[in-house]
Amino acid sequence: MTSSRPVFRSSWLPYVLVLPQLLITVIFFIWPAGQALWYSVQNLDPFGLSSEFVGMENFRQLFNNPYYLDSFYTTLIFSFLVAGFGMLISLFLAALVDYVIRASRLYQTLIILPYAVAPAVAAVLWMFLFNPGLGLITHFLGLLGYTWNHAQDSGQAMFLVVLASVWKQISYNFLFFLAALQSIPRSLVEAGAIDGAGPVRRFFNLVLPMISPVSFFLLVVNLVYAFFDTFPIIDAATAGGPVQSTTTLIYKIYREGFAGLDLSSSAAQSVILMLLVIGLTVIQFRFVERKVNYQ
């Protein structure tokens, strides 16, 4: 029995091959994370030239700050809305395209197009559509007697950023769901139909369990996307307003760290956000993965 493990002539060659990736990880991930941990227990001046060790004081001030707690709850609500609706809509579209025989390539192309749009551009696009004075969608809403102004209404502002974020992420989810659906053997689906199972029953009892690994992967990816990668959308669409109703944790870190030059507070918020994402990921792997069928 032969081993498939590669054998290197030089003992140092494997380390040289891994070195570039290790350097990238250390420089762009481990070193910034270590700096954030260090700054979170320091009281830094606005330019970072002098510091004083304060222990957990920065964290205590954060959890006694009602504005920070509001942004914490806003982040949780926003993230679950983006991840939930993004995955449901993508799965629905993928199932429709997988079912359609004619012009399926055209539908795939149209659905994938938003993936090529930059997040800030996606936000501006939806801002124009929902512009209170010139927007096409707001014009039809006005005909129905509904007044739209996301610059003054917190609920409308949240709807706008969730809509733009979901629209931007649909293409990514769609590609994975469609590939998973097309990998299911047609013989299994046909056998279920012969046994008398209807389309809905076949989907929930046969198709959905078979694509559960992809669904679990996308759940993790979408939550991380909602926590971090939606910053350009929020910044371009609402800038965290009105009255901080769309200020998520990542945007609050930017506002206090880069705009307000409060490096200690922003570092403490970065640590909390990092721990929150790690905690949610561990929970998903600990409990949600149990229901994933890899067979």
From Swiss-Prot:
The complex is composed of two ATP-binding proteins (UgpC), two transmembrane proteins (UgpA and UgpE) and a solute-binding protein (UgpB). The keyword Transmembrane applies. SUPFAM superfamilies: MetI-like (SSF161098). PROSITE patterns: ABC_TM1. Coiled coil: none annotated. One of its GO terms (cellular component) is plasma membrane. Belongs to the binding-protein-dependent transport system permease family. UgpAE subfamily. Part of the ABC transporter complex UgpBAEC involved in sn-glycerol-3-phosphate (G3P) import. Probably responsible for the translocation of the substrate across the membrane. Keywords: Cell inner membrane, Cell membrane, Membrane, Transmembrane, Transmembrane helix, Transport. It comes from the Bacteria. Residues 1-11, 98-109, 179-207, 284-295 are cytoplasmic. Gene3D superfamilies: MetI-like. Residues 33-76, 131-157, 229-262 are periplasmic. It is a multi-pass membrane protein. It is found in: Cell inner membrane. The chain crosses the membrane at residues 12-32, 77-97, 110-130, 158-178, 208-228, 263-283. InterPro entries: MetI-like, MetI-like_sf, UgpAE/MalFG_permease. Residues 76-284 form the ABC transmembrane type-1 domain. GO terms for biological process: transmembrane transport. This is sn-glycerol-3-phosphate transport system permease protein UgpA.
